[in-house]
Amino acid sequence: MAKPTAWLRHLAKVARPDFASLRGAGTALGLAVCIALRATASAGAAEITRTDLAIPGLPDTVGFLYKGPVAAGDLLNLQSQISALPPDTAVAVVLESGGGNLGEGIALGKFFYRAKIITVVNRGMGCHSACSLAFLGGRSAKTGQPMRIKSSMGPLGFHQFSLKFDPNKKYSKKDRDDMVLGVQDVTSALVEYFKYINEDLTFLPFMLRAPTEQIRLLPNEDTIASGVHVFNEQTKLLIDPSLIRQRVKAN
């Protein structure tokens, strides 16, 4: 497992903007307004409703569908619905979101981990960026072990840091320094989050490999290798990544 401090330095270096390349014809390009993972430009919170779970192997589990952009206040809305259930009720949350608020995505993931809530990505629009971070917090109430389930036809996507520049603004050395500090704050938050949910840094390379303006979809093989359960839509069987890992390690 990679050391968090090493990854932090690497991520800050990768995400650091090349300001020299932004100077052209005596005109300074304005610098970033935000430093974050891909955000969905949409107002309003996600819609949270009760849903049936189409995946076998989850008996006596109450399902919730989380659909829409990740926005501030979503965690509280979800907790409002879950609080109506007996505390010993097993819960799974099906995530369908193109992304959104990074901080809220991390907060959701931490809650899933603390409350031992299973996370699911079904076929459909999938779960990307801030949503995929929340997905990683899924855990089984029965075993206490990670329990993140992705449909073999369900898109799960990660996104690299994006730095947005305003061509109508001039930037100063302080602006540049603030931007670099912002990058480091985001990477620190990600590393702290992975540590909180007891996850190694396996998923960080998927973020780094993604083009800045694109989502990198995780193939099923990489999903299993990363410790995520995959529900095979063809065989209707749930693949336990720990068993595959043991078999591969034994050989």
PLM features: residue spans?
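Short, glycine-/small-residue-enriched flexible loop/hinge segments at domain edges that mediate gating
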Residues: 89-104, 118-126
